[in-house]
Each structure stands twice: as C-alpha cells, then as structure tokens.
Amino acid sequence: MSNHDPISDMLTRIRNASQKKHTTTTIPGSKMSLSIAKVLQKEGFISDINEEGEGYKSQIILGLKYSGKNKFPTIRSMQRVSKPGLRIYKNTRGLPKVLGGLGVAIISTSKGVMSDRDARKQGIGGEVLCYVY
C-alpha cells in the first residue's frame, strides 16, 4: 500500500502508540519526519529520537513521554492542518496560538521546520503542518 501523506501517517502512529502507552514507536524515515520529530523533542513532547537503517529502509524510533503515576501521555492531541488536497499557509501575524500558547503549531518555513513560537521570533510564516497539545 502506498502512503500518500507521510506526515499524517507519522502523527497517527504517534497518537496510537501514546494512547496504548507504548514507550517507543517506529515511523518510516524521511527528512520531513525527522524535522517534525526534532521540533516535538525540543518542545518536550517526546523524549528521544534514534535513526536506524539507510535509504528507503530507514526508520525513526521515537521515545514517548508520560507524566504521573497513571502514565498520562504528554501528547493529548495531534491534528493535521495542511493536507495534500488543501494546503494552509499563514504569514507571521496569522500564525495560530494553540490552546492559548500551551500547545504548539508545527510550521514548515523557508528556513526549515519549526514551532510557531520560533517562526514568530524570526518573523516568518509558512505552511501550518499540524497542531500538537
């Protein structure tokens, strides 16, 4: 089966693994997936990132974070915003604040993939890939 939207596939794998309280999850490797994973790690949603394999067989292993005795997932929701059929672009002023600043929007800009906070600091806009909170 071909995967037409690897970003949605990545978000779904992370969401499913965190709901089942898995400690790690594996996603197919790509530059975009790795960039998104680095933003998630920087923002404190995942614990670690490991790359395995080369070329088309590469995989990224993400360590998921939980809090409290009941292992409540740090990622409560992940929503894909810009889709292959309908791309969503925002300028600096139009960048959304997710949950009043408690969540993060992941933006693909001309300077790479970054969080909405970093994009605002640099004064650039871009494609809104997803919301994470």
UniProtKB/Swiss-Prot annotation:
Family label: Belongs to the universal ribosomal protein uS8 family.
One of the record's GO molecular function terms: rRNA binding
Query: Is Ribonucleoprotein given among the entry's keywords?
Result: yes
The protein's UniProt keywords, in alphabetical order, are: Ribonucleoprotein, Ribosomal protein, RNA-binding, rRNA-binding
The record, for PANTHER family, names: 40S RIBOSOMAL PROTEIN S15A
Q: How does it assemble?
A: Part of the 30S ribosomal subunit. Contacts proteins S5 and S12.
Under SUPFAM superfamilies, the record lists: Ribosomal protein S8
Task: Give the protein name, as stated in the record.
Answer: Small ribosomal subunit protein uS8
The record's section on PROSITE patterns has: RIBOSOMAL_S8
Q: NCBIfam families, from UniProt?
A: PRK00136.1
Q: Write out the GO cellular component annotations.
A: ribonucleoprotein complex; ribosome
Q: Which Gene3D superfamilies did the record assign?
A: 3.30.1370.30, 3.30.1490.10
What the protein does comes down to:
One of the primary rRNA binding proteins, it binds directly to 16S rRNA central domain where it helps coordinate assembly of the platform of the 30S subunit.
GO terms (BP aspect): translation
